[in-house]
Regions:
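Short, positively charged
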Residues: 6, 30, 188-189
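Penicillin-recognizing serine hydrolase domain
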Residues: 21-24, 98, 124-265
Length: 265
C-alpha cells in the first residue's frame, strides 16, 4: 500500500510539472523603457489573451489611419461565431459596430469579437495575422510571432514578457485616447454589458491604470498592467501564474519592489 501511495504521489507531482506553464516576468519604466526587474523575460511563451493587445494596437492604428471607422458595421462570420469562450455571443450574419467589438476584446477578452475585428479590417484572420507581424517588427517586438487574433493556443503563436511590456507601453504612448478601455470594470459591448476579466487587479491594486488578462492551459494565468505611483509609471508583465490570486499577488509584489527602488534613487 505504501508503495502504491508513493507511486501515486510521484505521478501526481510529475503531472503537475508537465502541465505547469513556464513562469516569466518583467517590470519596465513606462516612460523610459528601463528594465527594473526581469526573469525569463526573453523566453518565447504562449501569450493567451495578451494576444489581444497586438490585435487592438493594430485596430486602433487602422482607425487612426482611416482604414476603418470606429462606428463601421462589421458582419459576423461563422468562424467568429464558433470561437470558444471567453466570448460575447456573436452570431453568424449579425452586424455590430467595431467600437463594441473593441470593447468586448479589451474588457472581456472575447475571442469571437477578436476574430470579427481581424476579419472586419483585413477580410480574414490570416491576413490580419500578417499585419500583426508587420506591426510587431515595426515596434521592435522581435521575438513575437502571431498566428491569430485571439490568443488560443496554436503552434508558432508565441511572444515574450519583454515584448508584451513594450507593446503595452506603446498602447499608452501611441493611443492614449483608447487606453481607458483597459481600465473599465464594465462596459457596454453592444449585445450586452461585459465585465473586465482583470477587475480584481484594477480594483485592489491602487494606481492601476490599465490591465489585460489571459489564460490558457499552455500559458497559465498571465497579465500586463500599467501601474502609477506619484509621478512614476511602470508596466508589469507576468506569465505562467497558477491562479488569478497568485497572479495578482505577484503583480502587487513586483510593483511594490519597483516603486521602492525608484523612490530611493
Amino acid at each position: 500500500m505504501r508503495l502504491l501511495l508513493t507511486c501515486f504521489v510521484v505521478a501526481l507531482l510529475c503531472a503537475t510539472t508537465i502541465f505547469a506553464a513556464p513562469y516569466a516576468a518583467i517590470v519596465i519604466n513606462a516612460d523610459t523603457g528601463e528594465v527594473l526587474h526581469e526573469e525569463n523575460a526573453d523566453t518565447r511563451l504562449h501569450p493567451a489573451g495578451l494576444t489581444k493587445l497586438m490585435t487592438l494596437y493594430v485596430a486602433f492604428d487602422a482607425i487612426e489611419s482611416g482604414l476603418v471607422e470606429l462606428d463601421e458595421t462589421i458582419r459576423i462570420s461563422k468562424k467568429a461565431e464558433l470561437e470558444p469562450p471567453a466570448k460575447l455571443g456573436l452570431r453568424s450574419g449579425q452586424r455590430i459596430k467595431l467600437r463594441y467589438l473593441l470593447r468586448a476584446a479589451a474588457v472581456k477578452g472575447a475571442n469571437d469579437a477578436s476574430t470579427a475585428i481581424a476579419e472586419g479590417i483585413d477580410g480574414s484572420e490570416a491576413a490580419f495575422a500578417r499585419r500583426m507581424n508587420g506591426y510587431a517588427q515595426e515596434l521592435g517586438l522581435t521575438r513575437s510571432s502571431w498566428k491569430n487574433a485571439h490568443g488560443l493556443t496554436e503552434k508558432g503563436h508565441l511572444t515574450t514578457a519583454r515584448d508584451i511590456a513594450n507593446l503595452f507601453a506603446a498602447h499608452q504612448r501611441d493611443f492614449p485616447d483608447y487606453f481607458n478601455l483597459f481600465s473599465r470594470i464594465t462596459t457596454n459591448a453592444g449585445l450586452r454589458d461585459v465585465v473586465n476579466s482583470a477587475r480584481r487587479l484594477l480594483v485592489n491594486l491602487r494606481g492601476t491604470e490599465g490591465a489585460k488578462y489571459g489564460y490558457t492551459r499552455a500559458a497559465g494565468f498571465n497579465t500586463a498592467a500599467v501601474v502609477r505611483h506619484r509621478d512614476m509609471g511602470i508596466v508589469v508583465v507576468v506569465f505562467g501564474a497558477r491562479s488569478t490570486a497568485t497572479l495578482n499577488k505577484q503583480v502587487a509584489m513586483l510593483s511594490d519592489k519597483a516603486f521602492s527602488e525608484l523612490i530611493t534613487r
